[in-house]
A protein has these predicted regions:
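Substrate-binding groove of N-acetylhexosamine-processing glycoside hydrolases
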Residues: 1-123
Length: 123
């Protein structure tokens, strides 16, 4: 589902607090990763739109301690990233003006029911 950039930037702050993890439990955790399920990503524009600028927010979230995070400051820095996206021809979601880049339409998915069995009635 849709994940606002503010939520991505806030990750992983507090997401695991309710799990009652010990320091030992957290030892194998060395970083964060981002996934994109691509079964409905049919071209490069849709791919870019789905990950940018959220990937920037997640990257900064990974190297910034929770106490140093400031979404307003991040938003200002993100403006430079938008300039770079434009230079590189990346089709991104612009949270400042969502109508600037409309979401590329995905493929039409037609759901088919199970094939009807052929019935042969004999006396």
């Amino acid at each position: 589902g849709f994940c606002p950039i503010e939520d991505v930037y806030a990750f992983p702050d507090g997401w695991y607090e309710s799990w009652d993890l010990t320091d030992k439990d957290m030892t194998p955790v060395i970083g964060i990763q981002s996934n994109l399920w691509t079964e409905l990503v049919h071209n490069d524009d849709r791919f870019d739109f789905m990950i940018y600028p959220r990937l920037c927010a997640l990257a900064e979230s990974g190297w910034t301690e929770a106490k140093n995070k400031n979404y307003a400051d991040f938003s200002c820095r993100l403006n430079s990233a938008y300039e770079l996206f434009d230079e590189l021809g990346i089709y991104y979601f612009d949270y400042r003006d969502p109508s600037a880049h409309k979401e590329p339409e995905g493929p039409v998915i037609k759901k088919k029911g199970a094939p009807k069995p052929k019935m042969d009635y004999r006396d």
